[in-house]
Amino acid sequence: RHSYFQDEATNADWGYSQSMTDGAVLSNVPGRPVYLEDGTEVTRVPVGEESLKAWMLPGSYIYMYDVYGKELNTFAKLTTNFAGKTGPIHHRLILGADFRNSGNLGKGKVFDPENPPYRNLSYDFASQRNRAFKDIPFMNHLGVYAEEKIQWLMGKHELNISAGIRWDKVCGFGDGFSPRINASVDIIPRHLTLRGAYGITLKAPTLLYMYPDKAYFDLVNFNNASTSAPDGQKFQVITTRVFDAENKNLEMAKNKKCELGLDLKFNKMRFFITAYQEKCDNGYTIAKSLNTFKSVPFVQYSEITPRPSDESQIANLKEIATNPYLLSYTTPMNALKYLVRGIDFDFDFGRVDAIRTAFNLNGSYMWRKSGSNNYMFWNKIT
């Protein structure tokens, strides 16, 4: 699978580093060191990143990226059935297990590091890097379940019960149980049936929530590109900070649903109505948390003047300020909550043979309320 995107970035003059390492300090010329006036080296180039650079992007440029996907999914299922009868009660037992394996062997999002995609304006100094899908571990999902179906004949009345439980395990993530029960009983045989159900469904996260991209930030420590310095003496110094956005406390989303219904049959007419409620308090979302705010030292430099007479030599720097700077990013969370209530109905008034016409009325009503269990954050400017 392959997709392609191209756009123009405007007001894009912002710092960008090619480094993938937290704490790396690069200049705009690969491997070139930058020093303070006392000879202390400002740049910190990680091993293996000697050919990388950090620079100021132009105010406007065309960027493009490709997304290469090569999905691989496997599925296996094993089921066995047992049936029997005890007096007026018919039993049917179902036991089974299934296994799912899913992942992607593609190259993922690929772009020219000289022209990276437009940054996220919602986060100061935010940046992004290439990441291959094949570097993301495969998801292994195992499920084991059991279900018992009972049919009990009580004279002309019939009681049907189906009860089951399922255990799900996502390797490297977590597990949980999801029980459910469905029942129906004839109040008036062949005319009125009462139905009810209750169940819990566990939803495993996708790979996006299990293995999110790291949060990259490129802080511009020095930039004299807009000064009168000769081109050979214009340079930038940029510090890269990298944070793991994975949430180790993420858990399976739990959905609780119950319903109650009536089935009415009279002559050729049939009326079905069902009321239901669905509730979830830990659905998946991506948002900020108390742990995704990071205070980092932000060092700023200025040039030592006069500049070297050799225009191929850059000036040394001096530190003018070091202040704490609050960076923030998002992480997968169980913060989504919602409540759904509704009614479904289907009224079949039967066929009127005299005019060869059948009348049917069906519809539904749904009410939904959603919100977040997360804290609300905002910047207070004084």
What are these regions (language model features)?
Residues 1, 7-14, 48-51, 62-63, ...:
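Surface-exposed extracellular loop regions of Gram-negative outer-membrane beta-barrel proteins
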Residues 1-2, 74, 91-97, 159-163, ...:
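Transmembrane beta-strands of outer-membrane beta-barrel proteins
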Residues 2, 227-328:
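Membrane-embedded beta-barrel scaffold of Gram-negative outer-membrane proteins
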Residues 2-6, 99-105, 140-142, 165-171, ...:
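Transmembrane beta-strands of outer-membrane beta-barrel pores
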Residues 6-13, 106-112, 173-179, 207-212, ...:
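Outer-membrane beta-barrel translocator domains and adjoining extracellular loop/strand segments
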Residues 15-159, 210, 318-320, 336, ...:
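Outer-membrane beta-barrel transmembrane domain signature of Gram-negative proteins
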Residues 76-82, 144-150, 181-185, 260-266, ...:
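Residues on the lipid-exposed face of transmembrane beta-strands in outer-membrane beta-barrel proteins
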Residues 152-157, 277-280, 295-382:
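Gram-negative outer-membrane beta-barrel transporters
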